[in-house]
Structure formats: structure tokens, C-alpha cells
């Protein structure tokens, strides 16, 4: 990755290009919850995304509980959402779709059980 930081575009600009993603509460970030058939599929998704993240040198904030993966994307160096986050979100949606996941918006009013 170059030494130049990506330009911040903000969640409000990024979200129209993405399906099922929401603005995170209290910060310039986007988030989504994926639900898979089982833990193996969820972990397989995370492994695939981890390899892509390493290539991009851009890493998600995420949490896995059984068949769910909750994801938050932001570019810390830029102080908010950038094109890197949009690219990562699009890759995640494609990878999740190949594994039969359903994407559920990760919202503060949804229980994270």
C-alpha cells in the first residue's frame, strides 16, 4: 500500500453503493451482520476475507459467534469511511453470497446474540 492515505468519503457517500450496510452509530463507519448456515461457513468466510484484507492491507473490525459474523469497516488512518471500505464491503458481500449467507443490517436496536 502506498504511503498516501486514502481520501475520506464518509458513510453517507459510501452507503448508496452497498446493499444492506448501515452507518455505525457514533462514528464514521459502516456495518453489517452476515448469517451463515453454520460455524464452518462463517469461519470459511472470515478466512477468505482475511486473505483479501492482507492483500489490500486493510482489515475489518469483526466478531464471530457461531453462524454470525458482525462487521464494521472504517479507515482509521483517514478518520472514517474511504473507497477501501467500499471495496472491502463489496468483496465481503460477494464472498458471503457464494457461501449462501444472508446479510442482515447490524443495527444498535438488534440484539447481537
From Swiss-Prot:
UniProt key word Lyase: yes
GO BP annotations, alphabetical order: tetrahydrobiopterin biosynthetic process
Reaction catalysed by this enzyme: (4aS,6R)-4a-hydroxy-L-erythro-5,6,7,8-tetrahydrobiopterin = (6R)-L-erythro-6,7-dihydrobiopterin + H2O
Superkingdom field: Bacteria
Record key words, sorted: Lyase
Assigned EC number: 4.2.1.96
Recorded GO MF terms: 4-alpha-hydroxytetrahydrobiopterin dehydratase activity
PANTHER family noted in UniProt: PTERIN-4-ALPHA-CARBINOLAMINE DEHYDRATASE (PTHR12599:SF0)
Family: Belongs to the pterin-4-alpha-carbinolamine dehydratase family.
Protein name listed in UniProt: Putative pterin-4-alpha-carbinolamine dehydratase
Species in which this protein is naturally found: Bordetella pertussis (strain Tohama I / ATCC BAA-589 / NCTC 13251)
Lineage: Bacteria, Pseudomonadati, Pseudomonadota, Betaproteobacteria, Burkholderiales
Amino acid at each position: 500500500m502506498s504511503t498516501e492515505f486514502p481520501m475520506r468519503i464518509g458513510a453517507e457517500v459510501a452507503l448508496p453503493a452497498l446493499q444492506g450496510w448501515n452507518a455505525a452509530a457514533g462514528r464514521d463507519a459502516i456495518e453489517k451482520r452476515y448469517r451463515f448456515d453454520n460455524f464452518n461457513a462463517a469461519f470459511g468466510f472470515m478466512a477468505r476475507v482475511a486473505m483479501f484484507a492482507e492483500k489490500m492491507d486493510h482489515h475489518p473490525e469483526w466478531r464471530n459467534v457461531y453462524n454470525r459474523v458482525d462487521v464494521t469497516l472504517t479507515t482509521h488512518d483517514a478518520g472514517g469511511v474511504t473507497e477501501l471500505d467500499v471495496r472491502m464491503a463489496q468483496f465481503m458481500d460477494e464472498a458471503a453470497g457464494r457461501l449462501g449467507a444472508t446479510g442482515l443490517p447490524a443495527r444498535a436496536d438488534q440484539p447481537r446474540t
